């Protein structure tokens, strides 16, 4: 799942995965994460920002990828507080919903404990896709 502020390239990276690896794009802006007994699922939402993607389906979340634009592709795993800070900036906190903050923070804690978080400094090219697939999946898909 790609994370970052508006305009950083979340939809661009998703479109590269769609083009080169036939990946399904469920949303270009806001994804809900559900914790199940086996895994975490990313769900498409009707809030899609400027992208046209808003599928009512889910996909397993294998890793969190925090995007940065760069002249060359590189990736590194984040740890500790750096991981928390990088991901927290992309979380939608439901302050108005009774029990929503607690559920959100509990899910975030479980998510950050269970999944790797990477910072991907990248260009909008197939090389970024290859780098992520080697790092996250341990092989070329």
Regions found by a protein language model. Name each.
Residues 1-3, 18-141:
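Glycine-rich, often acidic-flanked micro-motifs
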Residues 10:
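Conserved lysine of the Walker
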Residues 13-14:
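Post-Walker A alpha-helix
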């Amino acid at each position: 799942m790609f994370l970052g502020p508006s305009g950083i390239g979340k939809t661009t990276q998703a479109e590269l995965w769609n083009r080169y690896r036939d990946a399904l794009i469920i949303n270009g802006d806001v994804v809900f994460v559900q914790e199940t007994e086996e895994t975490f699922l990313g769900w498409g939402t009707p809030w899609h920002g400027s992208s046209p993607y808003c599928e009512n389906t889910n996909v397993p979340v294998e890793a969190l990828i925090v995007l940065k634009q760069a002249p060359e592709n590189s990736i590194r795993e984040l740890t500790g507080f750096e991981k928390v800070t990088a991901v927290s900036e992309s979380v939608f906190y439901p302050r108005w919903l009774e029990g929503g903050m607690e559920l959100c923070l509990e899910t975030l804690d479980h998510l950050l404990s269970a999944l790797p978080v990477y910072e991907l400094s990248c260009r909008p090219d197939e090389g970024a896709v290859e780098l992520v697939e080697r790092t996250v999946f341990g092989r070329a898909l």
